[in-house]
């Protein structure tokens, strides 16, 4: 009887593991880190520039959750240059093979670098000055949006979001610093 009980226990554990693995395949965890060494005239420095975690979940074939949490410059707090940011957290519904709808916190579809801003998409260690100080790279807002492909090479990206902080009294209304976080 002991051998039969042992085999039954092993079989039930194997079944439980198979069920657990099936459920876990719907959730993915990923990320990347970026460590910089800069040797400049004013001194050299090492900076863990960013550490990014992705957590995604597929509820159904056409319904997904995407999120991105980022820690910049290793340290955050009063008097420190670091930041902890929730850059993305949105649900996307693929209502057809070529079109989808999303809502939540997402990257605004503007420019070349905003939605594809990972370190391997620009040349060098740092982003160039225009993309770093003028164009809002990594600009996210809360809202909803549609995107898709009408024909090969003809796509669209339309978003309704919380917008820019362009106060008329703001002397620097054209600067990147006026982008507010949702």
What do these predicted ranges mean?
Residues 27-33, 65-67, 101-103, 156-158:
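Transmembrane beta-strands of outer-membrane beta-barrel proteins
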Residues 35-41, 50-52, 71-75, 107-109, ...:
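Transmembrane beta-strands of outer-membrane beta-barrel pores
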């Amino acid at each position: 009887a002991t051998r039969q009980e042992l085999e039954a226990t092993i079989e039930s554990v194997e079944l439980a593991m198979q069920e657990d693995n099936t459920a876990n395949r719907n959730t993915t965890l990923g990320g990347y880190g970026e460590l910089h060494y800069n040797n400049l005239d004013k001194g050299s420095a090492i900076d863990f520039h960013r550490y990014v975690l992705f957590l995604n979940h597929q509820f159904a074939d056409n319904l997904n959750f995407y999120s991105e949490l980022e820690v910049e410059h290793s340290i955050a707090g009063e008097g420190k240059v670091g930041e902890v940011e929730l850059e993305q957290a949105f649900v996307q519904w693929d209502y057809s093979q070529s079109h989808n709808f999303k809502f939540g916190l997402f990257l605004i579809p503007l420019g070349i670098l905003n939605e594809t801003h990972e370190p391997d998409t620009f040349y060098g260690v740092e982003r160039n000055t225009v993309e770093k100080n003028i164009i809002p790279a990594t600009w996210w807002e809360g809202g909803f949006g549609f995107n898709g492909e009408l024909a090969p090479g003809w796509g669209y990206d339309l978003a309704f979001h919380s917008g820019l902080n362009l106060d008329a009294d703001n002397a620097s209304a054209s600067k990147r610093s006026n982008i507010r976080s949702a």
